[in-house]
Structures are given as structure tokens and as C-alpha cells.
């Protein structure tokens, strides 16, 4: 993977301050996905593939910060936003990239072999917080 090119592709999503829709780890850590807002019709999905390491720290440990489960929140209550995605050559294995990600109250480090970026239709999406939204 060309790290500089992938960083440019990420930057072209204009992620700065974009609300985060979801973050999840699947397949025993092999895939990690971050989904964030683009506009009212589309969103971005960034999938980290063949992950060798996934570490993250949440805001649950912050003193007097939150005492509720994130899964019970509505979209407008989430409060996570994309601040920075930094891609670096992984020092211990040149076939991997180290991804340092700041999502406000969530700091993530992922070591993976590939990154897929998708621009998807919001109308087709399923997010955990949609179950908490009220129908008006």
C-alpha cells in the first residue's frame, strides 16, 4: 500500500470535525471500521483490513465524564468527531501501516496491511443509534 497516497485519499474525505456514526472491530480484530458523516445523503466508511493490532481508549475513564452506555444514545448525543487520521510506516514490519486516529473522546491505534475507503448512500445504512431515534 502506498501510505502517502492513502493519506491523501483520507484527507480528501474532509473528515475534520465530521460526526462519527460508528466504530467497530470485527472478525477477531481482523477488520476495524470507522464510519463518519459526509453530508445529508452520503457517509464515509473507512475499513482497516488484515489488522495485526487494534488499541483504543475511550472517554469512559475520564473523571466525571460519562456514566451511561453509548449504545443507548441518539445520533445527536454521540459527540464523537473526526479530528485526525495519521498514517505511518509501521517500524516493526514494512508491509504494515500504523494508523493513529483521534475521534475526540476516542483515541485509536491500528496496525494493518490495507485500508479501504468507501463513499456510501446514507439511506441504505444501518447504525446502532437508529434504534434509539424517535419517529415523529
Region spans (language model):
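Surface-exposed, interaction-prone regions used to assemble/regulate multi-protein complexes
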Residues: 1-136
Amino acid at each position: 500500500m502506498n501510505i502517502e497516497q492513502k493519506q491523501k485519499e483520507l484527507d480528501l474525505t474532509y473528515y475534520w470535525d465530521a460526526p462519527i456514526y460508528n466504530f467497530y472491530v470485527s472478525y477477531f480484530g481482523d477488520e476495524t471500521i470507522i464510519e463518519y458523516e459526509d453530508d445529508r445523503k452520503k457517509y464515509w466508511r473507512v475499513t482497516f483490513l488484515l489488522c495485526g493490532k487494534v488499541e483504543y481508549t475511550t472517554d469512559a475513564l475520564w473523571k466525571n465524564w460519562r456514566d451511561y452506555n453509548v449504545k443507548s444514545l441518539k445520533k445527536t448525543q454521540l459527540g464523537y468527531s473526526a479530528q485526525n487520521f495519521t498514517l505511518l510506516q509501521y517500524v516493526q514490519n514494512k508491509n504494515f501501516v500504523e494508523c493513529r486516529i483521534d475521534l475526540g473522546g476516542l483515541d485509536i491505534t491500528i496496525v494493518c496491511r490495507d485500508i479501504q475507503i468507501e463513499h456510501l448512500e446514507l439511506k441504505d445504512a444501518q447504525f446502532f443509534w437508529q434504534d434509539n431515534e424517535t419517529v415523529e
